[in-house]
Amino acid sequence: MDVACMLGANETYDVAKFRVNAKKTTPLTIAPANAPENATVWLLPYRETKTLPQGTVRKAETFRDNYAYYTVALNMPEGTVSCPLMNEAGEVVGLMQQPYKQNDSLSYAVSALFADSLKIGGLSINDATLRSTFIKKDLPKELDQALLTLYVGQASVDSATYVEMLEDFIARFPNAPDGYTYRAQIATGDRRFADAARDMEQAIKVAEKKDEAHFNYSKILYQKELLMSQDAFAEWSLDKALEEAREAERLQPQPIYRHQQAIILFAQKKYAEAADIYASLYDSDLRSAELFYEASRCKAAMKDTLGQMALLDSCVATFNQPYLKEAAPYILSRAHVLLDANQYRKAVNDLNEYEKLMQATVNANFYYLRFQAEVGGRLFQQALDDIDQAIRMAPQYDLYYAEKASLQVRVGMRDEAIETAKECIKIAPDHSDGYLFLGLAQCLKGEKKEGLKNLKKARELGDTQADTFIEKYTNQ
């Protein structure tokens, strides 16, 4: 007989439970109680025999509260590991274990009740013993445990195995919408949109909580239009996604369903409508940094900088000080908006806070960003320190040398600017920036001949700014 699926396993006691494909079988009866000590027992071998090996229970040690591990006075024949141990009523009391040595006068058996108690649970999909065999695993009989298996299985089994699990789930729980929803997600990913649509309609049909089914359909539609809009399917659109979210809210008003509508409206570039919905959610149980951040994006798209800033302030205010890393992305976003609004010193404050939180991951681009804010805020020494750090982290990026030389010229550090510009030229001799700032610093220092020569080189390389300086210093 072929094994259909595993129903459980225990490596410690070396037992497994499985289902077989068989049209007709006569099962043995499992004894309802443990065999007592001194009870007579018989070993039923795999092959038919006229007489059964007989023994006596010498010891019945209890494990896991009510199961017995038997020591039996019985010389165990070869090839009878896992064979049933029977009582005088013909019931199975145990399963034979591997003997310590051949021809030993004592043998061992584990309770048949224990073997029968093995079952598949929601997390059994990750059980090392079950995973060591490639035999198919059964789904749990309880719906909540089977759903847990599906959830965990998304990340722990290959796609073919997962699809097979889904089919088994739908066959066992045909009135549960979850199986159809999961299968629709897979079909959508495979661009089988008609199949996905059928599954979601079935999910809605069988669902007791139809609002949840409509909401799940809305999420699938939104993800498809967001990530696969180039693959047209006439029945699906963002309008359809919005319709499903609104139907979910009609059936059972919940903030999460309104939030879904806001997300879709934003994708449709209906920013004012989305912003209004977000505003209605600020005092709901969805209130969070992410909610305020999403709302701020609506204001940004509407060119409402003040509104965007206010929402980012609310976003950051959801975190207590001292901040944890979770606040870092939002602080950085606010810094970018402050920088764009020419509020340089406030931007620097946010960038300082971000650096403290993300010290191990900040890169050269971060220090260049803060350099720009510091230059705008006239924090020149801090700016020079940051551009030096950017150069240390990305020493072959000529832009940083050019920016450093530019600032050095601005603050009167002419000798330093000349050295920095020469480094820039060494790294990128075909770029104009190094020659421009070298020439400018030299002219400011009184070395007009060399300075004009370098300014003209910058002009040859396409820098139109050089013309202004050439004209200025030629006529002096």
Region annotations inferred by a language model:
Residues 182, 216, 260, 294, ...:
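Canonical tetratricopeptide repeat
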Residues 172, 206-207, 250-251, 283-285, ...:
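Structural marker of alpha-solenoid helical repeat scaffolds
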Residues 189, 223-227, 267-268, 301-302, ...:
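Register position in tetratricopeptide repeats
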Residues 1-52, 66-69:
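Conserved active-site neighborhood of the chymotrypsin/trypsin-like protease fold
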Residues 21-27, 51-120:
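Active-site region of chymotrypsin-like
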Residues 95-161:
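C-terminal cap/linker of serine protease catalytic domains
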Residues 177-178, 210-215, 253-258, 288-290, ...:
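Helix-start (N-cap) detector for alpha-helical repeat units in TPR-like alpha-solenoids
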